Amino acid sequence: MAVSYKKLLDLLIDRDMKKKDLEAAAGINHYTMNKMSRDENVTTEVLGKICAALNCKVEDIVDFLPDNDE
């Protein structure tokens, strides 16, 4: 199953935040943020930190997409 973090990037724009601001607020590193920018998987711990920093739910920042072969 593929993931998309477009919702997260849209939320950052809506809140006038830069990725670097989120990295600091959530305590995540630049490498992790880059993975998310490329729609690569990250741990649930990272998602939890981001949700806590942004005061949101996981479904507010990530979409789970079906694989092409399904």
Model-predicted regions and their roles:
Residues 1-21:
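A short, Lys/Arg-rich alpha-helix, primarily the initiator
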Residues 13, 24, 52:
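Alpha-helical residues within the helix-turn-helix
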Residues 13, 27, 38, 66:
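Residue-level detection of the helix-turn-helix DNA-binding "recognition helix"
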Residues 21, 32, 46, 60:
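Residues in the helix-turn-helix
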Residues 28-42:
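Recognition helix of helix-turn-helix/homeodomain-like DNA-binding domains
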Residues 40-52:
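Short, basic-rich loop-to-helix N-cap that marks the start of a DNA-contacting helix
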Residues 55-70:
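Short C-terminal boundary/hinge segments that cap the last helix of small helical domains
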